[in-house]
């Protein structure tokens, strides 16, 4: 793939609370924890996780304005009576099922070593820009095979918006 441009728009409606027009989106970079925390006013909305132990970067957990977590706990923080299937489905993320025959969608730490050669890894390479004035941050990653050979270079800008009744973010890929 020479050029990949995709826009994903997710709109998360507020359950019990309404945010004022003058709400502020704030990013806190936490390099030691390998994450960027995204706050709306003083309330955590989500975190962009880019740990070396992940097979792709994710937004996790995601909360409503009333504080209800809308992402499941497993596999990061399993909850009582929660199913423990699909370890690759953590939070909100972007991936493909097949690029040059490699599965970037289903990869996780539960794949047997003898099957790893069939799976790709999205390796975080850096934060390019955090722009609170425009409510967005840009990150870069390499899509690699199990030996580290780079198939794609990704540059993603996460943009966040707040209105009276909903919050949203978009994730255009370049």
Where are these regions (language model features)?
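Bacterial Sec-dependent N-terminal signal peptides
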Residues: 1-23
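Contiguous beta-strand segments within globular domains
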Residues: 42, 172-174
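Extended, loop-rich substrate-binding clefts of extracytoplasmic carbohydrate-active enzymes
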Residues: 86-172
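Generic structural motif
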Residues: 15, 41-43, 53, 65, ...
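Beta-strand-rich N-terminal accessory domains
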Residues: 21-91
């Amino acid at each position: 793939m020479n050029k990949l441009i995709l826009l994903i728009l997710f709109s998360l409606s507020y359950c019990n609370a309404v945010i004022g027009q003058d709400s502020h989106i704030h990013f806190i970079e936490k390099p030691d924890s390998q994450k960027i925390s995204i706050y709306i006013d003083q309330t955590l909305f989500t975190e962009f996780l880019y740990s070396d132990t992940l097979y792709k970067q994710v937004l996790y957990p995601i909360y409503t304005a009333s504080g209800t977590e809308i992402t499941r706990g497993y596999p990061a923080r399993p909850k009582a009576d929660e199913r423990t299937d699909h370890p690759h489905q953590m939070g909100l993320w972007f991936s493909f099922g097949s690029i040059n025959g490699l599965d970037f969608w289903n990869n996780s730490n539960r794949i047997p070593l003898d099957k790893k050669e069939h799976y790709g890894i999205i390796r975080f390479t850096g934060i390019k820009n955090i722009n609170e004035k425009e409510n967005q941050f840009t990150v870069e990653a390499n899509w690699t095979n199990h030996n580290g050979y780079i198939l794609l270079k990704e540059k993603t800008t996460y943009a966040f918006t707040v209105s009276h009744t909903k919050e949203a973010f978009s994730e255009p890929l370049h």
